[in-house]
Design a protein with these regions (language model features):
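Metallo-beta-lactamase
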Residues: 78-80, 86-88, 175, 182-274
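PEST-like low-complexity, intrinsically disordered acidic/proline/serine-rich tracts
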Residues: 22-41, 58-60, 65, 90, ...
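Accessory terminal helices/loops
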Residues: 14-43, 241-244, 255-322
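Divalent metal-coordination and catalytic microenvironments
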Residues: 59, 73, 83, 97, ...
C-alpha cells in the first residue's frame, strides 16, 4: 500500500521526509524519499525488503523506510523500539526484527505524535507497553491535523479501541531498564511539537532526536500540536548538552553528531530572530521569505528556489503569530 500526503507547501525537512536541500542527506535507496521532492510523499510498499537496516552497535539498529527512522534496541528482556512509521509497516518491522533477534518487542517509545512515527503502534500486540511524554499522549488522543499539511490521516487508534496509545507517560525524565540496557527519556520543551521526546541509549552513546532534528534544513513547527518557533532553538540547545552522547539519530536523515545538533539549533534561532526583525521592520512574510538566505556558516544547509520556500513561510508565520 502506498500513502500519499498532499502538501500545502513544499515540506523541506521534518515529519515526513527530507526535501529540497537535504536530498544529499538521504541514504541511497531509502524507501519513503519524496517523489521528485514535490507534490506528494511516497512511503513505499510496506515489506520486509523495503526496510534498510543500519547497525549502530551489537544491540542497537536503525530501520529506515516507511516513515520516520525507527531505532531497535535489543535488551536482555526484549526489544525496545523508538517510533513505528506509517500504517502498514508494523508487521514488516516485526518480521525484520526476527532477522536480528529472537526476542519480542516489549516496549515502544514514540518521539512525538505524528502519523509517520506512531501509526505502526496499532499493529503490535496490545501487550506491548507504549511510552511517551505527557503532552504526546494528549496529542495522540486528540489527533489534531498537522499544521501546514493536507490529507486524510485518520487516527489508527480510534478504529481499534485505542490499541497503540501510550500506557505510560513521563513529565521531564524517565529511565527504562538498568545497566547496559538503560534507556533515558527526556522532555526539554516544545520544538517540532509540544511533546518531543529525546531517547538516549546510554551504553551506545547514541540519542534519537525524532523530528525535533529531522535533518539539516527547516523543520516543521507544528503549532496545532504544541510546536513552537520561539522556543525551538532553546529546546535544541538543551538537548545538545546531553552528556555522553556521540551520535544522534535524526528523524528522517543520516545519523549525525552532537555538533550537528547544536548547529541546527543555532540555524533555527537565526531564522526566527531574522523573521521577527523583518516583522518589526514592517515587512510582509512573503518579503522576508523571498529575501532570506541561509547564512554561509551553516554547511550542509541550502537555499531552496524562490518558488519553493513554503516551509520557510510556514515557520515565519508560526513565529509571527506565537
Amino acid at each position: 500500500m502506498q500513502r500519499r500526503i498532499v502538501l500545502t507547501s513544499l515540506v523541506l525537512v521534518g515529519l515526513l521526509s527530507i526535501a529540497v536541500g537535504a536530498a544529499q542527506q538521504q541514504p541511497a535507496g531509502r524507501a519513503g524519499a519524496p517523489a521528485g521532492g514535490r507534490g506528494g510523499i511516497n512511503f513505499g510498499t510496506p515489506s520486509v525488503d523495503n526496510l534498510q537496516v543500519e547497525k549502530l552497535t551489537d544491540t542497537l539498529y536503525l530501520l529506515r523506510g516507511g516513515g520516520g527512522n525507527t531505532a531497535a534496541f535489543i535488551t536482555a528482556n526484549g526489544v525496545l523500539l523508538v517510533d513505528t512509521k506509517v500504517s502498514g509497516w508494523g508487521q514488516p518491522i516485526i518480521q525484520k526484527l526476527k532477522t536480528l533477534t529472537d526476542k519480542p518487542v516489549t516496549t515502544i517509545v514514540n518521539t512525538h505524535t505524528h502519523f509517520d512515527h506512531v501509526n505502526g503502534n496499532a499493529e503490535f500486540p496490545p501487550t506491548v507497553e507504549v511510552v511517551t511524554s505527557e503532552p504526546t499522549k494528549q496529542y495522540m488522543e486528540q489527533w489534531n491535523p498537522v499544521f501546514g499539511l493536507q490529507g486524510d490521516n485518520p487516527s489508527p487508534f480510534k478504529a481499534n479501541g485505542g490499541v497503540g496509545l501510550p500506557k505510560r507517560t513521563f513529565k521531564d525524565t524517565l529511565s527504562i531498564g538498568n545497566g547496559a540496557d538503560q534507556v533515558d527519556l527526556y522532555f526539554h520543551g516544545p520544538a517540532h511539537t509540544g511533546g518531543d521526546t529525546w531517547v538516549v541509549f546510554r551504553s551506545a552513546r547514541v540519542m534519537h532526536a525524532g523530528d525535533a532534528f529531522a535533518g539539516k534544513n527547516a523543520p516543521i513547527m507544528d503549532k496545532n500540536n504544541g510546536g513552537s518557533a520561539l522556543r525551538y532553538a532553546d529546546t535544541i540547545a538543551k538537548a545538545a548538552k546531553t552528556p555522553n552522547v556521540d551520535r544522534v539519530i535524526t528523524g528522517h536523515s543520516t545519523t549525525m553528531t552532537i555538533a550537528d545538533l547544536r548547529e541546527f539549533g543555532e540555524f533555527n534561532g537565526d531564522f526566527v530572530r531574522d523573521a521577527l526583525a523583518a516583522k518589526k521592520a514592517g515587512k510582509t512574510i512573503d518579503q522576508f521569505v523571498a529575501e532570506w538566505n541561509v547564512p554561509a556558516k551553516y554547511t550542509g544547509y541550502t537555499n531552496p528556489p524562490a518558488t519553493n520556500r513554503g516551509q520557510w513561510r510556514s515557520n515565519a508565520q508560526v513565529a509571527w503569530e506565537e
